[in-house]
């Protein structure tokens, strides 16, 4: 059996959870929604988002409306493609276990 190759930029549990949320509920979510839903600190979430942004999987957008400012996280086309490839690789890795 060939070695399993999963994208480490996505495979880390917090980043995987972020990507799952964006695919399932996105394509765009508020930073605070992700923070609260995933029970993360602001700094921890920001650190993982920077890694996903550097990979081109997400975009961060700051918006100000009246006195309220918010950061939105949007999955990119590249992020969708990388997530689909990740799921395909994971399915291939698990396929031998289904027999």
Give the ranges of each region predicted by the language model.
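Short beta-strand "wing" residues that participate in macromolecule-binding interfaces
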Residues: 60
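Glycine-centered, phosphate/nucleic-acid-interacting loop/turn motifs that mediate DNA/RNA or nucleotide
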Residues: 56
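N-terminal helix-turn-helix DNA-binding core of bacterial DNA-binding proteins
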Residues: 5-44, 65-66, 70-74
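Basic, amphipathic "hinge/linker" alpha-helix immediately C-terminal to the N-terminal HTH DNA-binding motif
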Residues: 65-86, 90
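Short, hydrophobic-biased segments on the C-terminal half of alpha helices
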Residues: 49-50
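Amphipathic alpha-helical dimerization/coiled-coil segments
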Residues: 1-3, 81-99
């Amino acid at each position: 059996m060939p070695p399993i190759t999963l994208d480490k930029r996505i495979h880390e549990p917090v980043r995987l959870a972020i990507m799952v949320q964006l695919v399932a509920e996105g394509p765009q979510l508020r930073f605070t929604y992700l923070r609260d839903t995933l029970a993360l600190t602001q700094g921890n979430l920001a650190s993982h988002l920077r890694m996903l942004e550097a990979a081109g999987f997400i975009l961060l957008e700051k918006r100000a409306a009246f006195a309220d400012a918010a950061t939105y996280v949007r999955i990119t086309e590249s992020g969708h493609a990388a997530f689909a490839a990740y799921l395909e690789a994971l399915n291939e890795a698990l396929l031998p276990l289904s027999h």
